[in-house]
């Protein structure tokens, strides 16, 4: 049977959509060029126009703008006629002073070949900024929707997700009109992204304005309300901590036994099973002819472990076996090999696997 043919025009359109979605789904600070005192005039006022955000790291409005500006940068990444850039005014005061910056964030438009800026006065959303840049630069770039890592709950899905005894679930009950909810939204999205590789952790939300009965069931009377539903307490407990990303990450790590930083990277504690430390010490201190006995003790203890610790325990045992087989140099050589792999372009799941193994190996070299 003949295969249906796709027209070149349709294929081209499809490829453009895929490219746009891919660009925005991987939006990051790297998509916005960070300018300094020495690079500003090398990049701005040259052969392309530039939109520049002058910001301060401590500024709340700047933090709120950051994810929108990063989406803008990702969308315009391949637009050769436009530069999306930023300047840290705490570090580069002279640049900000030169261009009359007195508050943060200040967004200025520099036409091609000009260092005479025009101040942007519009809304601080990726869509509004894109519309402005398109009108000034005669471009036609669209902001594609960014896939969310937050699980959106409904009355039909709430119980199956939140009451799942194999998951630790954080739920935000929000209202679309709520100002505090809007402020929290980009932070909550980043939190979900941090833990997207952890199958046992779910970051979710529920439109409590739309699903009032469910919100009332869980005692929600203000927005946003955050409740944590751990594996052992599906009645839920109030989250009363801070609402910055670092606060949430600290809470999840403590409650769920995870070990991630605010960028989603595993920390040096990931994979470490404290109860096995004495057995590792005994193994390393044993004479070669006694190591088999020390390994047997380790295997016995690992067999009693449950959950993620059971998986990590097997890596401890395999590491000990490799040391017996290849000698003490194995730890150093394998750690160096894993580090080389981590420096390559690998999937997040592979990176997690290698970091955990490297962390566990480090316990055999101390």
Curated annotation (Swiss-Prot):
Top-level taxonomic group: Eukaryota
Active site: residue positions: 59, 62, 178, 181
Intrachain S-S bonds: 59-62, 178-181
Locations listed in the record: Secreted
Reaction catalyzed: Catalyzes the rearrangement of -S-S- bonds in proteins
Site positions for Lowers pKa of C-terminal Cys of second active site: 243
SUPFAM superfamilies the record matches: ERP29 C domain-like (SSF47933), Thioredoxin-like (SSF52833)
Predominant place of localization: secreted
UniProt KW keywords: Disulfide bond, Isomerase, Redox-active center, Repeat, Secreted, Signal
GO molecular function annotation: protein disulfide isomerase activity
EC number: 5.3.4.1
Keyword Isomerase tagged: yes
Region forming the signal peptide: 1-29
Database matches in Pfam families: ERp29, Thioredoxin
Segments traversing the membrane: none
A cellular component term, taken from the record's GO annotations: endoplasmic reticulum
Domain Thioredoxin: 30-138, 139-257
InterPro entries assigned: ERp29_C, ERp29_C_sf, PDI, PDI_thioredoxin-like_dom, Thioredoxin-like_sf, Thioredoxin_CS, Thioredoxin_domain
Site entry (Contributes to redox potential value), positions: 60-61, 179-180
Similarity comment: family membership: Belongs to the protein disulfide isomerase family.
Protein name according to UniProt: Protein disulfide isomerase-like 2-1
């Amino acid at each position: 049977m003949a295969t249906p043919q796709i027209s070149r025009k349709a294929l081209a359109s499809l490829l453009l959509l895929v490219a746009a979605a891919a660009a925005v789904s991987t939006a990051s600070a790297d998509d916005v060029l960070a300018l300094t005192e020495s690079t500003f005039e090398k990049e701005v006022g040259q052969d392309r126009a530039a939109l520049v955000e002058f910001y301060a790291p401590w500024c709340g409005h700047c933090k709120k703008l950051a994810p929108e500006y990063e989406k803008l940068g990702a969308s315009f990444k391949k637009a050769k006629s436009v530069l999306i850039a930023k300047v840290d005014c705490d570090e580069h005061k002279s640049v900000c002073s030169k261009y009359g910056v007195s508050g943060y964030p200040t967004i200025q438009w520099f036409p091609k070949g000009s260092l005479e800026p025009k101040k942007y006065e519009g809304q601080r959303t990726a869509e509004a900024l894109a519309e402005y840049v398109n009108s000034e630069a005669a471009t036609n770039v669209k902001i594609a929707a960014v896939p969310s890592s937050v699980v959106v709950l409904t009355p039909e899905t709430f119980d199956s997700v939140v009451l799942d005894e194999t998951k630790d679930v954080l739920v935000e009950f929000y209202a679309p009109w709520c100002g505090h909810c809007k402020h929290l939204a980009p932070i909550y999205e980043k939190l979900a992204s941090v833990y997207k590789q952890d199958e046992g952790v779910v970051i979710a939300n529920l439109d409590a304005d739309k699903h009032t009965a469910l919100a009332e069931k869980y005692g929600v009377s203000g927005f946003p309300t955050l409740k944590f539903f751990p594996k052992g307490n599906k009645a839920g407990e109030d989250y009363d901590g801070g609402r910055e990303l670092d606060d949430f990450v600290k809470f999840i790590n403590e409650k769920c036994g995870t070990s991630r930083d605010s960028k989603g990277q595993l920390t040096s504690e990931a994979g470490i099973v404290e109860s096995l430390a004495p057995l590792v010490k005994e193994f390393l201190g044993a004479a070669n002819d006694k190591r088999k006995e020390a390994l047997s003790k380790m295997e016995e203890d690992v067999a009693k472990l449950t959950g993620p610790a059971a998986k990590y325990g097997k890596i401890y045992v395999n590491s000990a076996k490799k040391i017996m087989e290849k000698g003490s140099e194995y730890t150093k050589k394998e750690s160096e090999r894993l580090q080389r792999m981590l420096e390559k372009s690998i999937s997040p799941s592979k990176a997690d696997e290698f970091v955990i193994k490297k962390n566990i190996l480090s316990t055999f070299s101390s």
